[in-house]
Amino acid sequence: MCSRSVTVNCIIVTSFFENENLGKPCIVTTWVGSDPSLGSIMLNSHIDVVPVFPDQWDHPPFSAHKTEDGWIYGRGTQDMKCVGIWYMEAIRNLKKQGFQPKRTIHVMWVPDEEIGGHDGMEKLIETDFFKGKICPLVTPPKSNFQ
């Protein structure tokens, strides 16, 4: 995997990891904590969607069509773009209030959750980025951590 990074506001670092053969980028945004010796927190989201069948939609699936009563329809908005936005809005609001986390927080967007994660996330966890930093918690769907 190749990688490159950009820094935003001198606090948030965004890294792009891409499997050169597949063109499926993993995006990791990092908010460095005040105590880097502590284990990191990883919040995961995905940017892929299940296949679209346009004839089953009232509005074009990728249009983010807003109805007169305020509903917005778009493929992937609930699974799972909204969660990634929640993460970033929470970070933005916490930073605005002057909050500094003790632990480093990584927000990830992976490209292939809907098809098993073998081309993106699986390759990303094999990189040096993960070594000694993160202990992912993986649960089966609908497990609710039971």
Locations of regions flagged by a protein language model:
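Acidic/histidine-rich catalytic neighborhood of metal-dependent amide-processing enzymes
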Residues: W71, Q78-Q146
